[in-house]
């Protein structure tokens, strides 16, 4: 591998721009369909767009702030000395593959990926397990670096530090590289988007792409007639299953009567009273229009409906 660019004095915007030039570790899981928070469809649109999206949230902020702590704890637990990479790296054999390592381990052909996670996700790290999209990320780093192994240190908030070692598997890396390069060749280069996979993140991406409708335009969807039939079939099945599910819930309620709780082997059931206060918006608009207008805001969205014409 080679150092593509130093990150010591690189701005966040330029760092993001460099990452558009190839496939990074965090792209790997999304391209493989393993990332629950990001999809291949999103990766594609990020790569072809000139827009630099500096996305951030509290979880990402905490992950950055605690990276030093996780690396320090890893060194304490293993005795290995680590150092910052301070660069975006590029595979010499597969130039499309880029990587931004958290840490490199001094004196070894190995690296370290630092993670933080909720205690509610602790089971995903138990018994040697690693969330699939993180494992894909580490395999990507092994592919770029050519190293023998990579470590993942995950801080489970308030619970424990989990350390896993991933050893290079040449067949796994070969398959990963093939899929990443095919994604780039088949989609990014010709600018042909991959099919969305039904996740919420793809819905958000599509809604962002086409926020405004053209009321004077009607699209010909004849080519999708088979898909529309399939959707209708699925909708009918879901409706039937929802009714069956509700009927079961009704039987359970009849059995519980006024009991707040119920038990069965493997199940705990609750049917408890609760109270909530809601604003009567119609009355507020009628009796206090100034206050209603003061705290109201216009929200623009496109409503999507499909009507089956029998």
Residue ranges and their predicted role:
Residues 1-310:
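Accessory terminal regions of nucleic-acid processing enzymes
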């Amino acid at each position: 591998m080679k150092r593509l660019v130093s990150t010591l004095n690189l701005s966040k915007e330029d760092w993001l721009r460099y990452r558009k030039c190839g496939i990074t570790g965090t792209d790997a899981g999304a391209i493989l369909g393993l990332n629950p928070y990001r999809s291949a469809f999103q990766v594609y649109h990020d790569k072809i767009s000139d827009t630099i999206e500096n996305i951030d949230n509290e979880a990402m902020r905490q992950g950055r702030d605690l990276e030093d702590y996780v690396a320090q704890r890893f060194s304490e637990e293993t005795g290995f000395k680590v150092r910052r990479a301070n660069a975006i790296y590029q595979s010499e054999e597969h130039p499309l593959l880029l990587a931004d390592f958290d840490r490199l381990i001094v004196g070894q052909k190995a690296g370290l990926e630092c993670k933080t996670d909720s205690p509610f996700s602790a089971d995903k790290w138990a018994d040697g397990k690693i969330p699939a999209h993180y494992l894909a990320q580490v395999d990507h780093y092994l592919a770029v670096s050519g190293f023998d192994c990579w470590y993942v240190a995950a801080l489970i908030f308030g619970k424990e530090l989990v350390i896993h070692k991933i050893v290079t598997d040449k067949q796994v890396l070969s398959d990963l590289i093939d899929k990443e390069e095919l994604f780039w060749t088949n989609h990014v280069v010709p600018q042909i988007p991959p099919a969305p996979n039904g996740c919420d993140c793809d819905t958000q991406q599509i809604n962002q792409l086409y926020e405004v409708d053209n009321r004077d335009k009607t699209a010909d969807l004849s080519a999708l007639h088979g898909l529309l039939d399939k959707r209708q079939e699925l909708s009918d099945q879901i409706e039937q299953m929802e009714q069956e599910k509700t009927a079961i819930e009704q039987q359970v309620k009849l059995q519980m009567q006024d009991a707040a709780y119920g038990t069965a082997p493997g199940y705990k059931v609750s049917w408890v009273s609760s109270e909530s206060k809601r604003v009567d918006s119609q009355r507020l608009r009628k009796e206090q229009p100034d206050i209603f207008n003061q705290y109201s805001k216009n929200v623009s969205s496109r409503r999507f409906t499909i009507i089956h014409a029998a």
